[in-house]
Amino acid sequence: MSTESMIRDVELAEEALPKKAGGPQGSRRCLCLSLFSFLLVAGATTLFCLLHFGVIGPQKEELLTGLQIMNPLAQTLRSSSQASRDKPVAHVVADPAAQGQLQWEKRFANTLLANGVKLEDNQLVVPTDGLYLIYSQVLFSGQRCPSTPVFLTHTISRLAVSYPNKANLLSAIKSPCQGGTSEEAEAKPWYEPIYLGGVFQLEKDDRLSAEINMPNYLDFAESGQVYFGIIAL
C-alpha cells in the first residue's frame, strides 16, 4: 500500500466519524430553542384556559352586556327624578313681624309651594290623595323664668274633607321653667325647641295647621328656626 493510499484512507475514516455537537455555540443554540419551545407551549396553554373558563371574551359582548345593565338603571334614575319633581311639597316659615301670633308665610327666602300645595287661612291645603311627611319646628325662648311653671305646646292638626271636626295628628308639650325664686329666675335665660314629624295618609283638600299656645315666647333671632311643611312620598 502506497503512502498516498494510507493518507486517503485516514481522511475517509475521519469523515465517517460523527461530529460532536458540543462547543459553546452549539450549547447556546440548543438552550435557546428549548426555552422558546417551553414559552410557546406555556402561552398557548394559558390562553386556552382563559378562553375555556370565560375569563376573557369578545369585547363586543362585554360592551353590550354593560349597556344592557346601565340602560335600565339610567331609566330608573330619570323616572325617579321626574317623579320627585312632580310631587306636592311645601315649606313655609313664621313671619317675625306678626306680633302675638304664629303666622306662616310663603314669600320669604327658602320657602316653597310646589305642585298644587296652597297656603290659605294659615293652613296648608293638600292637592292630591297619598302619603305625606308632615313636619314642623318652633323655638321658644325667654330671658328668665317666671315664678310659676311655663307649659309650651305645639300641635299639628288636620281638618279633613271626610269629617268636619279638626283632629290632632301630632302634639308635644314642654316645660322649660319649673318656677322658683326671683333671684334664680333672673340668672336663667332659657331656650326650648319642639319638633314634630310623621307620615300620614291624606286626602285631597285636607287642611293642615301648625299651632302653639304661647306665641309671645317664639324666638325669631335667626331665620329658619320656626317652620312648617309637607312632602308627598
Curated annotation (Swiss-Prot):
InterPro entries: TNF, TNF_alpha, TNF_CS, TNF_dom, Tumour_necrosis_fac-like_dom. Signal peptide: none annotated. GO terms for molecular function: cytokine activity; tumor necrosis factor receptor binding. It is a single-pass type II membrane protein. Residues 88-233 form the THD domain. The soluble form derives from the membrane form by proteolytic processing. The membrane-bound form is further proteolytically processed by SPPL2A or SPPL2B through regulated intramembrane proteolysis producing TNF intracellular domains (ICD1 and ICD2) released in the cytosol and TNF C-domain 1 and C-domain 2 secreted into the extracellular space. The membrane form, but not the soluble form, is phosphorylated on serine residues. Dephosphorylation of the membrane form occurs by binding to soluble TNFRSF1A/TNFR1. This is Tumor necrosis factor. It comes from the Eukaryota. Homotrimer. Interacts with SPPL2B. SMART domains: TNF.
